[in-house]
């Protein structure tokens, strides 16, 4: 299973210089997990930069994969990761999600 960080989604959606790096993981929807936090972050950024229609299209693409809710277990695992690895909350939630799903 793969988890693509929100920055990876945004790079892919913008067809940025590193979009190809993320494309194979994003297009393999059967093996892709999308934390709900990623939905929030991507929707917000695309809404801000390109408008609601593009933002809705972005999250529609994301929802073709398996959506992972922020469960109590993930919410309690992420702070430990954040403190141990000295990373921000969003990154620790992404990492906790990836670790929880193998």
Describe each PLM feature range.
Residues 1-34, 46-57:
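Short, well-structured N-terminal submotif of metal-dependent ribonuclease cores
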Residues 6, 72, 91-92:
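Conserved glycosyltransferase catalytic-site signature
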Residues 29-32, 63-66, 100-102:
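Short active-site oxyanion
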Residues 36-37, 91:
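Short secondary-structure boundary segments
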Residues 63-84:
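Acidic catalytic patch
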């Amino acid at each position: 299973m793969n988890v693509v960080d929100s920055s990876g989604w945004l790079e892919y959606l913008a067809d940025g210089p590193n979009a190809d790096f993320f494309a194979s993981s994003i297009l393999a929807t059967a093996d892709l997990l999308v934390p709900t936090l990623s939905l929030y972050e991507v929707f917000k950024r695309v809404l801000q930069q390109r408008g609601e229609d593009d933002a809705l299209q972005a999250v529609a693409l994301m929802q073709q994969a398996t959506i992972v809710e922020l469960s109590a277990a993930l919410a309690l695992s992420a702070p430990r990761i954040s403190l141990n690895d000295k990373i921000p909350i969003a990154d620790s939630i992404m990492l906790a999600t990836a670790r929880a799903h193998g």
